Every structure is written in C-alpha cells, then in structure tokens.
C-alpha cells in the first residue's frame, strides 16, 4: 500500500506561538519522511511544516537502541535519551540519563544516578527552559527523588543536576494516572510547552489521540491541540511519536511581544 502524505492544516492548529520548524521521532522505523523515505528509530525528522522533511541521524547510536525524546540546542548540540543502557565514547549511559552529542563526542547532560533516579526508570522527555537554559525532563514511571514524587506525566525542572521544581504537575492538574509524557519542548519560552503523550486521553478539556501534539500556556493553563501527526502521513497509523522538538519564532516567545 502506498504511503499517503498530506500537508498539515496549519490553520486548524493555530495558536499564539508560531512554530517555524517541527522535529519528531517515532518508536519504530517507518517511511515518515516522505513516500519511500525511511527514518529509523534512532533518527528524527526535521519538518519545515511546508512540505519539506529531512531525516537526521545522530552518528554512533547502536542499531538496537531507540531515540526517545530529544532537544536541539541553538549551537547544534543534541540532548537526548535512549531506551536502553549504552556505552558511547567510553562512557556508560543509563536509560534515565540525558546524553549530550556535541562536536562528535558524547557526555552526560543529566546524571540520573547522581540525581537519585532509581534503576529501571527511563527518561522519556527532554527539553530546555527558554532557549538554552535549564533542563526540563519527564520519566516513564513514578519514583521519589530530592523531596519530589515524580510521576509519568510530570515535567521536572533540573537545577545543578538535581530536581528543583515541577514545571508541569500531573496530579495537581487532575491528569489520569495512566497518562505518560513521551515528548516535550518549551518552544524557546518559559511559559509554554509542546507535549506528546503515549496514549489517547483528555487534558484541560482537550481530547487527543496517541499521535497528537498538544501545547499548554502555563500561566493560563489553556491546552490546545497543535498537530495531528496522522495528517502528516498514514504511516503514523502504526508508528508512534516518542520525541518532539520545535523551532519557534523567538520574537513571540512570550506570546505577547
């Protein structure tokens, strides 16, 4: 069956923050770049939202690994998590670590063991506050660290390598305990988040499916469905989003400049 690619209806997903470029990854290899153009589960796709998509590879990742969520810094460095423990460049990284790829070398941007994250936990949300500021992270199961109970739909602020605050508090917002965040991006702001979940659900009165991307304006608590990846390609009927990053027009980063 031929793959059907559709241009997203941007007007249908309009919001206060203009996104100039969207990056996303899937949990399985699929032709999500274009018809007959494959991206593996170690890759991500860079999409200009005008019909042009490009496969991006992080060199050196083992074929058996899956790229979870990721953050692309303005200098081109990539911060990301993997679904398995791996040795890269002589350093061992746990699934809850955040790996930094910069100039051909790998290092730890977040040390899960030092932060008190138990073994068996996976990091599945990686972003930065504002553009190149503090890390925002999410994890796949509930655990306690540094005085916080961290839940799968929480977004945690990291200060000096430790959990310091909840940027998104799932319990306080009344989220279903079944919800798990698998992708986040702050869109170059300290006020907004782009979010992907690993299942369908409802948040803030907005009902969504597995491959929808939502945004939330944190000061007002208003949620909006921004993108339905199923409208980008029919391959999203079998592939599932597990990483998002966005390039925002920083002129409007607070939504009112």
Residue positions per predicted region:
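Sequence/structural signature of beta-propeller domains
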Residues: 13-249
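Bacterial N-terminal signal peptides
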Residues: 1-9
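Non-transmembrane domains of secretory- and envelope-associated proteins
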Residues: 251-253
């Amino acid at each position: 069956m031929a793959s059907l690619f559709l241009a997203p209806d941007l007007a249908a997903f309009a919001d206060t923050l203009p996104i100039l470029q969207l990056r996303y990854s899937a949990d399985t290899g699929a032709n999500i770049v274009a018809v007959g153009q494959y991206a593996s589960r170690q890759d991500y796709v860079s999409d200009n939202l005008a019909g042009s998509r490009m496969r991006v590879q992080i060199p050196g990742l083992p074929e058996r690994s899956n790229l979870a969520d990721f953050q692309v810094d303005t200098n081109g460095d990539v911060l990301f998590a993997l679904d398995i423990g791996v040795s890269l460049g002589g350093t061992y990284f746990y699934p809850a670590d955040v790996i930094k790829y910069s100039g051909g070398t790998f290092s730890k941007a977040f040390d899960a063991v030092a932060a008190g994250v138990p073994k068996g936990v996976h990091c599945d949300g990686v972003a930065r506050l504002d553009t190149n500021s503090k890390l925002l992270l999410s994890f796949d199961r509930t655990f306690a660290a540094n005085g916080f109970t961290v839940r799968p739909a929480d977004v945690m602020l990291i200060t000096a390598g430790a959990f310091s605050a909840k940027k998104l508090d799932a319990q306080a917002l009344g989220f279903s305990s079944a919800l798990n965040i698998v992708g986040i991006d702050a869109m170059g702001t300290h006020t907004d988040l782009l979010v992907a979940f690993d299942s369908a659900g409802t948040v803030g009165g907005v009902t969504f499916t597995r491959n929808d991307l939502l945004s939330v304006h944190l000061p007002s608590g208003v949620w909006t469905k921004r993108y339905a990846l199923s409208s980008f390609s029919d391959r999203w009927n079998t592939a599932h989003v597990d990483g998002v990053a966005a390039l925002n027009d920083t002129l409007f980063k607070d939504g009112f400049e």
